[in-house]
């Protein structure tokens, strides 16, 4: 049985007050935090309801679940999509639920692209290049993503590209090396990307990598078991596929390229984009 998540949070707060930034958590404690993370994902499915939740918070007579500051504090303001996204960007810049973890770096990296995009692509977290340029997917993996979009017949400016975590995860003696975000880091930043989704209202979302699938959809397992199907996020279809960096790590494997491309073909079909015979045959074995 999992430990009461309130006890885990109290322990983490006490350790933080003592100046500790890293602690060991056993499986029960981790499971408690995972349950909290899943509840947070469910609670922020519709960011426009956040203000109402805040108003009702003090009037609730039932025993509340552990309070998630990100859910309570986030406000969406503005007359149009661009203005609303700007309001989220400003709040993200000093997002206390993320900064309080003391495990993320200081520079915030927000999204890029069109507020009216039909296609939204979400990565896990910014890396060294993204932190330096303050824009998601600008390094080698970003170039791969640009190539994929070009092959689809769309430009980077037509889509909306974001990351689940808005700050680069930190490491001891860190230079250009990166690490994937933890469940706690994803939970802290989840309200931000959920607000972006609510504002942009894309026709579909591409989740780039297993970490995003875990943080955004609560999935766990191998990418091969998650892809080739549509998942649902607040009524928006989501396709899970390989992160562009995996193309680099796989040594240019045509099998990996074809698998990713098949997910993109499925997205193109759902978006009613034209698909040529040449596009259909990309990365197929030559007869």
Regions found by a protein language model. Name each.
Residues 5-46:
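N-terminal intrinsically disordered, low-complexity tails
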Residues 21, 37-287:
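A polyanion-binding, active-site-adjacent surface
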């Amino acid at each position: 049985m999992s430990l009461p998540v309130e006890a885990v949070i109290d322990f983490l707060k006490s350790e933080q007050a003592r100046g500790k930034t890293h602690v060991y958590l056993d499986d029960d404690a981790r499971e408690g935090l995972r349950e909290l993370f899943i509840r947070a994902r469910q609670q922020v499915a519709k960011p426009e309801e956040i203000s109402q939740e805040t108003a009702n918070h003090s009037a609730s007579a039932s025993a509340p679940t552990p309070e998630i500051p990100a859910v309570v504090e986030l406000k969406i303001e503005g007359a149009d999509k661009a203005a609303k996204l700007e309001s989220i960007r400003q709040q993200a810049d000093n997002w206390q639920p993320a900064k309080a973890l003391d495990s993320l770096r200081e520079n915030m990296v927000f999204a890029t692209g069109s507020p009216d995009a039909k296609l939204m692509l979400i990565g896990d977290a910014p890396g060294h290049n993204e932190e330096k340029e303050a824009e998601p997917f600008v390094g080698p993996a970003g170039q791969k993503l640009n190539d994929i979009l070009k092959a689809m017949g769309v430009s980077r400016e037509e889509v909306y590209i974001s990351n689940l975590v808005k700050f680069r995860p930190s490491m001891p003696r860190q230079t250009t090396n990166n690490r994937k975000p933890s469940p706690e880091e994803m939970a802290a930043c989840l309200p931000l990307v959920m607000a972006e989704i609510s504002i942009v209202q894309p026709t579909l979302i591409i989740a780039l990598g297993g970490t995003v699938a875990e943080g955004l959809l609560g999935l766990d397992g191998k990418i091969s078991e998650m892809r080739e199907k549509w998942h649902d996020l607040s009524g928006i279809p989501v396709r899970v596929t390989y992160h562009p960096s995996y193309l680099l790590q796989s040594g240019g494997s045509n099998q990996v390229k074809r698998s990713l491309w098949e997910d993109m073909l499925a997205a193109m079909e759902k978006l009613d984009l034209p698909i040529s015979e040449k596009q259909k045959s990309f990365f197929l074995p030559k007869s």
